[in-house]
């Protein structure tokens, strides 16, 4: 089932007529927030990790593939291209490519973003949706490790890593239980759990390449293209 275009068309209206669409509407498809443990993210080029995430409230799971790609200096800032691929049941896979500043705690401010819904051409995300109260792309929830509990040796898919069981907390006071390892870039998270979600690694490695296919168009041209495609089906 193709990702519905109604929320995206609604976004176009909201940009032109802000009162037309409520702030609660989701506009950019396939976006999920991520918990990142401060000081554990590694910007290793080509590194990738594949996770299964359980949404406890909905009792639904989805898969997320995170990868670190090439570096780029943007307006004098050291930045890195990252990609997040989200695959949800009965929905089109969505790849989000973001250019974020590199900080010691992980990805910082977003500078650019490109989104591609499976079966469609990619589009550039307007800056409006990269920062501030309207941010929809690349949301991260930093958590600070407050206690290291025990050291563990873990094996998965023939790979053996050394890890720590830790307790962490977000700025909003959300508690995070996690198993972390420096041998598992880029997230360095083997498993993490909050009251809302549980994240478990499936596999990880090196050699990641971009999954965006084709040159991105502007968001408004992309909207027009999709409307034309829908009209041609009728």
Predicted regions: what is each one?
Residues 24-234:
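Acidic, serine/threonine-rich low-complexity disordered tracts
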Residues 7-18:
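Bacterial N-terminal signal peptides
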Residues 1-5:
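Positively charged n-region of N-terminal signal peptides that target proteins for export
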Residues 19-23:
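Signal peptide processing junction and immediate N-terminal pro/mature segment
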